[in-house]
């Protein structure tokens, strides 16, 4: 008996594929500067809201980058970054951003690393299952960013 598996979607390929770590804070600054906010980014808060079906507008992407950068620098009490990963550091299509307050083993050395807290994707995203619900303060942060009530 043979079983057929569905081919991976582009998002699944990017999400499960090789990513490169942004190790230093100055590398994170450079990554943000290379992102075109109007290039068609989907913004995902894993475990907070359903995967978006529409790309975010340029103003929302710019606001997200500014606020996530501030959050990471304030909450990740290390001299290095190491919690942001991209499929390509020069021209990213997918960026995984781990919540500094819910890291677990984000480097992938665990059989079940936690999902990232946030994803920026130029490909339509799919739901990412998180076994741990997002903390209330992260939900409020995301809702405030999007202007939701």
Task: Go through each PLM region and give its residues.
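Hydrophobic alpha-helical segments that drive targeting, anchoring, or assembly
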Residues: 34-103
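N-terminal "first-domain core" detector
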Residues: 1-49
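Residue-level signal for the start and early helices of compact helical domains
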Residues: 2-5, 11, 74, 109, ...
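Glutamate identity and glutamate-enriched acidic tracts
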Residues: 4, 10, 78, 126-127
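Polybasic, proline/glycine-rich intrinsically disordered low-complexity segments
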Residues: 20, 26-28, 93-149
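Arginine residue identity/basic-tract feature
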Residues: 13, 18, 34, 67, ...
């Amino acid at each position: 008996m043979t079983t057929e598996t569905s081919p991976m979607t582009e998002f699944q390929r990017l999400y499960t594929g090789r990513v490169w770590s942004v190790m230093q804070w100055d590398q994170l600054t450079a990554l943000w500067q290379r992102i075109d906010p109007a290039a068609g980014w989907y913004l995902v808060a894993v475990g907070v809201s359903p995967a978006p079906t529409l790309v975010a507008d340029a103003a929302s992407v710019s606001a997200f980058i500014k606020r996530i950068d501030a959050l990471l620098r304030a909450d990740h009490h290390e001299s290095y970054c190491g919690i942001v990963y991209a499929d390509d550091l020069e021209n990213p299509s997918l960026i995984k951003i781990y919540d500094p307050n819910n890291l677990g083993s984000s480097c992938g050395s665990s059989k079940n690393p936690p999902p990232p807290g946030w994803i920026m994707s130029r490909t339509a995203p799919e739901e990412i299952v998180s076994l741990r619900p997002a903390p209330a303060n992260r939900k409020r942060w995301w809702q405030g960013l999007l202007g939701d009530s």
